[in-house]
Amino acid sequence: MVSRQEQFEQVQAVKKSINTASEEVKNQALLAMADHLVAATEEILAANALDMAAAKGKISDVMLDRLYLDADRIEAMARGIREVVALPDPIGEVLETSQLENGLVITKKRVAIGVIGIIYESRPNVTSDAAALTLKSGNAVVLRSGKDAYQTTHAIVTALKKGLETTTIHPNVIQLVEDTSRESSYAMMKAKGYLDLLIPRGGAGLINAVVENAIVPVIETGTGIVHVYVDKDADEDKALSIINNAKTSRPSVCNAMEVLLVHENKAASILPRLDQMLVAERKEAGLEPIQFRLDSKASQFVSGQAAETQDFDTEFLDYVLAVKVVSSLEEAVAHIESHSTHHSDAIVTENAEAAAYFTDQVDSAAVYVNASTRFTDGGQFGLGCEMGISTQKLHARGPMGLKELTSYKYVVAGDGQIRE
């Protein structure tokens, strides 16, 4: 096993080669990575079977689905890499140019960050997404996956590095930390001078640990306590469609709805229909029904478990939905601002003034009017695959694509000027 220190030194030794690589060279490398990923399907599936067998009974079915791979999912990962090839290279982009009175020409240019560390949980697709995005944005990467997905991740990284071996980019620009202990995560948090940026992707426990302990700069990809508010002027059919998609299409992801707020004027009509759609109809179809966590007002219209205070602060990542009835738009916004993780929140309304108030007052990375929160995604936003959804305001916010993985520098051109 290569030590963490050796890995940090290896990636530092080769980072300049990727920081300044041409777009053509990087695109050739990405295509080779995608091809070798598909070619290694058999090996990756064998490794994934080991992880799945070890994880069964230890994590939820929803989380098992995140971990699971088949040939179609591997092909989708490769397709994601190829899509990055089609994206414009951000490195070298001129952001601003100005000329001072003394003749100095100042150019602000986009540059790579350097070496980016990614700590993530049992999500195999993050491995290929992170490798592709960091490479195209001119960065080297150090990956540390969760132990539940280690065999799968190792097989994926092996395939990606084999692809790089056929190009002029050194395979060491992608590093996988082999130690999956908690100590390895803390070592990355303290790796100032080796890592230029650290990005955690996972649950609240992981993200909070990184934010609280890292001395390396961090971009917080926050948890998603995502709200949908059904206003008194909402179209109910539209609302039901949005709720169904936001909650059931993929409940294990961070842009899935966790809390439903309903105006009291709509509760009596929409909540029974919601119960029919999310419970009765799903049972009839052989699908897992939604489990409601209801406040006292909501429980008058639909059956379910009484909500506890913490239910409105929980990212369930499962077929569980907290429901609260509110008396006004202002109460809905106040609730969101008290409980939101500032990820994605939505209003369903036909009232333009209500929509404007909601979008002005809700301070989240993505705020929706009459649309599902499931669109908060790099691919859906036209950014390609993403590094995560940033819920902070500094450097990056929302889906992080290529540009969010860069910095900039000033190039100052003169003709012998000196400062008086």
From Swiss-Prot:
Keywords in alphabetical order, please.
Amino-acid biosynthesis, Cytoplasm, NADP, Oxidoreductase, Proline biosynthesis
State the compartments where it is located.
Cytoplasm
The pathway to which it is assigned is: Amino-acid biosynthesis; L-proline biosynthesis; L-glutamate 5-semialdehyde from L-glutamate: step 2/2
This enzyme catalyses: L-glutamate 5-semialdehyde + phosphate + NADP(+) = L-glutamyl 5-phosphate + NADPH + H(+)
Q: Which PROSITE patterns match?
A: PROA (PS01223)
Q: Name one GO cellular component term.
A: cytoplasm
* Gene Ontology terms describing biological process: L-proline biosynthetic process
Task: State the source organism's domain of life.
Answer: Bacteria
Write down the top EC class of this protein. Answer: oxidoreductase
Keyword Endoplasmic reticulum assigned: no
Annotated GO MF terms: glutamate-5-semialdehyde dehydrogenase activity; NADP binding
**Protein EC:** 1.2.1.41
Query: What InterPro entries is this protein classified in?
Result: Ald_DH/histidinol_DH, Ald_DH_C, Ald_DH_N, Aldehyde_DH_dom, G-glutamylP_reductase_CS, Glu-5-SA_DH, GPR_dom
Gene3D superfamilies referenced in this protein's UniProt entry, alphabetically:
Aldehyde Dehydrogenase, Chain A, domain 1, Aldehyde Dehydrogenase, Chain A, domain 2
UniProt xrefs under SUPFAM superfamilies: ALDH-like
Q: Which family does it belong to?
A: Belongs to the gamma-glutamyl phosphate reductase family.
Role, per record: Catalyzes the NADPH-dependent reduction of L-glutamate 5-phosphate into L-glutamate 5-semialdehyde and phosphate. The product spontaneously undergoes cyclization to form 1-pyrroline-5-carboxylate.
HAMAP family in UniProt: ProA
| Full protein name | Gamma-glutamyl phosphate reductase
Q: Specify the species.
A: Streptococcus pneumoniae (strain CGSP14)
Lineage of the source organism? Bacteria, Bacillati, Bacillota, Bacilli, Lactobacillales
Its gene name is proA
